[in-house]
Amino acid sequence: MISENAPSSPSSKPLLRALRGEAVWPPPVWLMRQAGRYLPEFRAMRDRADFLTRCMTPDMATELTIQPIRRYGMDGAILFSDILILPWAMGQSLEFIDGRGPVLGAIRSEADLARLDPKRVQDAVAPVRETLSRLTKELPDVTTLLGFAGSPFTVSCYMVEGGGSRDFAETRRMMQTNPALFDRLIDTLTSSTAEMLCGQIEAGAEAVMLFDSWAGILPPSAFRRYVIEPTRQIVEYIRARHPKTPIIGFPRLGGIMVREYAQKTGVNTLALDTVADPAQISELVSEVRPGLTLQGNMDPMILFSGGETMIREAQAIRDAMRGKPHVFNLGHGVMQHTPPENVAALVEAVRAV
């Protein structure tokens, strides 16, 4: 256990304050994929169990979540899990293969979709809720606990393709040739994601994040239909049950569509990818969502490279957002071979006054 202190109030948690719209200085910092293979202590646990087992074993998932907090004192601890836990929980086969990534039984027909059972989800993900419950007791009092899920469109891409893809051709084909089937898949994921995130909040998550990693492959009309609308429905559902819980949305590579995303989804925080300029995006969305928190967005490659260039870039992003609600993060996940000392230097640079 890291902390023996009495429970703190939300006002003492810098990340939670920023996610609720406060301009905190210096900005809170956490990193996507901060619990990952770049850490030697993470690699040491890889030999003990496969990836899915680590996600679904509370002892392991708790330890993996805490590792970057213990090492760096991050302001946020994001649950160690995976966006594909949801389709697995509904009954889709899932295996993580070294060098290849996730492999799922592809959804290509009505019969394939019919084999999934959303009613299984809450029981199947009970170990995830147990992990969150344990983390509420073991994290430092100033650390905000983050839950997360994949957004419906991104999760559907993996479900239809049967894994990762360069172009998600089968997903795009289904959208065109069998839109009714694809719509049912999106609807199923939307309701199940909303319910699963509420379960995470009830288990202890203080904020949740929706990862839409492949949002940027869609043209505007499809982006509205399959990214904005499902996200809006999820936010609405969560807010009805947990009105004070901040929600972070990450429509990666959404480009100009992020303005409409910010306006219509209702997320509290807009996470930015590496190609976005935080100051420009802040100005772009200020008319439709004044006071919206932005999160991001240093290039993970700059973190990988380290040195003075990294320090200058990190502080330039930080300084450009001074006086506005901002959470420092990357524009994508920490790269596998990133030197751990670079992460330490980054956190120090962001926090330097």
Curated annotation (Swiss-Prot):
Pathway: Porphyrin-containing compound metabolism; protoporphyrin-IX biosynthesis; coproporphyrinogen-III from 5-aminolevulinate: step 4/4. GO terms for molecular function: uroporphyrinogen decarboxylase activity. GO terms for cellular component: cytosol. The keyword Magnesium does not apply. SUPFAM superfamilies: UROD/MetE-like (SSF51726). It catalyses: uroporphyrinogen III + 4 H(+) = coproporphyrinogen III + 4 CO2. It comes from the Bacteria. The record marks 82 as: Transition state stabilizer. Its main location: cytoplasm. Keywords: Cytoplasm, Decarboxylase, Lyase, Porphyrin biosynthesis. Pfam families: URO-D. Its EC number is 4.1.1.37. It is an enzyme of class 4 (lyase). InterPro entries: UROD/MetE-like_sf (IPR038071), Uroporphyrinogen_deCO2ase_HemE (IPR006361), Uroporphyrinogen_deCOase (IPR000257). It is found in: Cytoplasm. GO terms for biological process: protoporphyrinogen IX biosynthetic process from glutamate. Substrate binds at residues 33-37, 82, 158, 213, 332. CDD domains: URO-D. Belongs to the uroporphyrinogen decarboxylase family. Catalyzes the decarboxylation of four acetate groups of uroporphyrinogen-III to yield coproporphyrinogen-III. Homodimer. NCBIfam families: hemE. This is Uroporphyrinogen decarboxylase. The gene is hemE.
